Amino acid sequence: GKIQSEKVVRGLKRPNNVDIEYGLKIGGKKVDIAVTTERMNHQLRIYSLPDMKPIDNGGIPMFEGETGTEFRDLMGIALYKNPKGKIYAMVGRKNGPTTGGYIWQYELSDNGKGQVKATFIRKFGTYSGKKEIESIAVDDALGYVYYSDEGVGVRKYYAEPSKGDQELALFATRGFSEDHEGISIYHTSARKGYILVSDQGANQFHIFPREGSAKNPHEHPELKVVKVEAKQSDGSDVTAVPLNKTFKKGLFVVMSDDKTFHYYSWEQIKKHLF
């Protein structure tokens, strides 16, 4: 791919993670958005797609009122669109409480002036205190949010606030060499697919069933480990949408620490599963 320099956003103070969502209603129109965490300014930045124009009135402060060391230093971000069309941001930070409430959830909406506002909804999520939490991923269709508690495992919660804050699962607790990092979700049908989790230090991904087991939807046994060429990957994404002749069943993109992105067809990943 080629960088579109006219759409590059510069001058942010340590942008950390990014996610996209479709159809946020602004000024009576549906707008696709890209949202990134700006760590050192303790705020979200929101841009319309595909033009990458800021629509956040200069930035939206996060974790207001928190005073602990690095408790406002933003890291992970994942967006969730519920069945009614409401869009939420799940936001993580460099450090946080070990007593619950590590992730804060905000509803994104029109402020009435053509810009986006964020309304605090809830805080949830266990943190081991061992390392940090960066990678967050949401399964819109099934209504779950997952995040990597580095060095511990992947934690699973309901994405919908009304369903409560209880932890549904802690999986991927064995076989990782160092940090648990990027989480990607591949759909094979409306309710089935795979969860891919980066084992950063080993340059590989552990793969788990999206739908859980036959007896328990919150039981995610490991299916396979797949090696990749990317080094120290802490970011990835996957789509099941057919893109072209090379990526007929989707594309898995993996970030490498040499500032490159590695592209894999889903067929390259799938051959290791069966």
Question: Language-model segments: which ranges?
Answer:
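Loop/turn-rich, solvent-exposed surfaces of beta-rich toroidal or solenoidal domains
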Residues: 175-221
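Short loop/turn segments immediately following beta-strands, especially the blade-tip
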Residues: 1, 23-26, 46-56, 105-117, ...
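Blade-loop segments of beta-propeller domains
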Residues: 1-42, 61
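Asp-box/WD-like beta-propeller blade repeats and closely related beta-sheet repeat scaffolds
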Residues: 42-95
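Conserved blade-ending motifs and adjacent loop-strand segments that build the rim/top face
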Residues: 8-11, 168-183, 215-243
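A short beta-strand motif characteristic of beta-propeller blades
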Residues: 2-11, 53-68, 117-127, 166-174, ...
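Structural signature of eukaryotic scaffold interfaces centered on beta-propeller domains
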Residues: 14-30, 71-87, 129-143, 181-191, ...
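Blade-level signature of beta-propeller repeat domains, shared across WD40, Kelch, NHL, RCC1
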Residues: 234-274
